[in-house]
């Protein structure tokens, strides 16, 4: 819940309080604890999946997706092997803009991906620029993101859709 969180402080590390008064929370944060928010935070923590298991699942999906995407003529994978497994960035050279593919995927297949990089909505991605990608590649890049809810079947549908779109629009 908004307004509630946890802070883990390594032994020996001293932090200064942001507000003063009261002796609660080892003099770091004064005030009355918000019990409903704390209960909500506890419920959110309990709802978290096993992070190791989730990371393994996502890593497997990423490897599966990359193997399928590499087989599609007309797709180049921008993401390096050491990139986050939660995201794959691809480039389709035959399209003038990534927006064309985005719209086609969402309107006709119910598949939602993004363009550019997550940290650069509406402007050139500093992440893709730092990867030394050209402006053309950056403009035509698509970002595929994974969550714990995705399956190999989702990836198969995406790859089928991308193949269809590339065939349908040989050059736009």
Regions found by a protein language model. Give the residues of each.
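Pyridoxal 5′-phosphate
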Residues: 1-172
